[in-house]
Amino acid sequence: MSGPQYGAQPGGYYNNNNNYPPPPPNSYQMNPMPTDGNYGQQPQYGYGGGPPPQQYGNGYGDGGYAPPQGPPPNGSKPPPTDGYGGPPPSYDEVFKVQKPKYNDWWAGLLFLATVAGFVAVSAISIHGYADNRSQNNGSLNGQRNTFGLTTHTIYLFVWVLICAIVLSYAYMWMARKFTKQFIYATGILNIVMGLVTALYMLSRKYWSGGIVFLIFVVLQALFFWSCRSRIPFSTLMLQTAIDVSKVHGHVYLVSAVGGVIGTLFAAYWAITLVAVYVKFEPDPNNAACRNAGGCSSGKVIGLIVFITFAGYWISEWLKNTIHTTVAGIYGSWYFNSRNYPTKVTRGALKRSLTYSFGSISLGSLFIAIINLIRQLAQAAQQNAAQEGDILGTILWCIFGCLIGILDWLVEFINRYAFCHIALYGKAYFAAAKDTWKMVKDRGIDALINECLIGPVLTFGATFVAYACGLIAYLYMVYTKPAYNDGGGFTPVVVAFAFLIGLQVCNVFTTPLTSGIDTIFVAMAWDPEVLMRDHPDLYHRMVQVYPHVQEAIHA
């Protein structure tokens, strides 16, 4: 009796009673693979019900092979494997959506409304800042303004942006040139930089900032030490992602364009932040308060919260759009490496900005809300520390850790859901559910947990954020602006400098994480493609992590 075919898995996993798409159909006849003496066991079979093919010969699509078993349910058509015997197909043909529609459109409209609101607040605030520019200039440290942020702060954020761009670019360059040493260097440099920043702040008796940075350093050091055994497998996955990106140069083009857009937005956001303080900060010396609308602390707090939320959402949307676009490139490489499609980058970007725009906006919204809550918790923790409230500081620290765990969980789901969205064009919740179910059932979650690239790149982004925060702190200490005579604005400026550095670096490094995430998701869809079309990668994975055979054949 022949084994089960795609679309008729045991237990009805891929039948029409659920929403899970089958792995991409293989357009070749399944032949048994002999026992590999290197691994000492018979090959395990995947979701297809049969073993991977014995040979890697071409001639696909000549009519002598078993046809695919039909499209998956719910209008999602899996990508066909290498189609030989004709011109390369386009991205839209390979990853065709049967019934395309604008998924999660309401989230897309809400995102556009938030962008419009941010632009409106920015325009009003910058106009008020421009009308009173003479009061906010005076000199580098803005001596004419003693009540709020000034042009001095814009100069500061310019240096922060320069630092973020240079370090992010250098970090990406180091990943390409020194891949094997990259993970060790990232962990060590991040810990050292965080420790230096914490000790310097403590030496200046800036207790709240120093304690927070010191806690981060201790947690990162413990994590890095406990994960030493996972570095070889992580290095292999990073090398694979970089090797593919070198062949398909659009990966770095997307990264460069995204980095430029992210930097420009960060500059625009920083100017808006300063302008809000100038326009609405209540003070008898603030000329802007004499105009219509007036000033109040409530307006300042409300607008700062709104532009912070909008900044998180817009930057997350940009990062996830890059992620979804790059996922299309790596998905095309995995499933069609021998007949790479045309217009891949264009097709993936088009889908991200049209049918999947709402889904990307929705996933980004969750992260933006969580990040905003964490930012508010950090501000409350710093305020409690400044007031000497030890219990409050500890409680806010615990709350921040819980929010951090929630952030990690949602980010984890988003990364793989967006890979599914890039290739299948499904709605956010359906993609998240289907992808996680498939990854879990395949055992790929074990490989994901074994790979450190996500945490390592987060370490790198944190290193850049540390540097930006340190520059902001030094700038505030040595230029001594009049508005910061009592040091009250130092935590605010340092926190936002940290945020800018973190988000800019995350945009630059997104293509690397996208590539690795897509490879994992593609392996869950069809591990036989890995063994047939990428045997060298499969054998190297087995060498550094022997349990990979059990994981991908679960």
UniProtKB/Swiss-Prot annotation:
Molecular function terms from GO: transmembrane transporter activity
Database matches in InterPro entries: Choline_transptr-like
Extracellular side: 127-153, 203-206, 277-297, 374-389, 473-487
Biased composition (Pro residues): 68-90
GO cellular component: membrane; plasma membrane
GO annotation, biological process: transmembrane transport
Listed transmembrane segments: 106-126, 154-174, 182-202, 207-227, 256-276, 298-318, 353-373, 390-410, 452-472, 488-508
Keyword Transport: yes
Region (Disordered): 1-90
UniProt record similarity statement: Belongs to the CTL (choline transporter-like) family.
Function: Probably involved in transport through the plasma membrane.
Name recorded for this polypeptide: Protein PNS1
UniProt organism field: Neurospora crassa (strain ATCC 24698 / 74-OR23-1A / CBS 708.71 / DSM 1257 / FGSC 987)
Gene (name only): pns-1
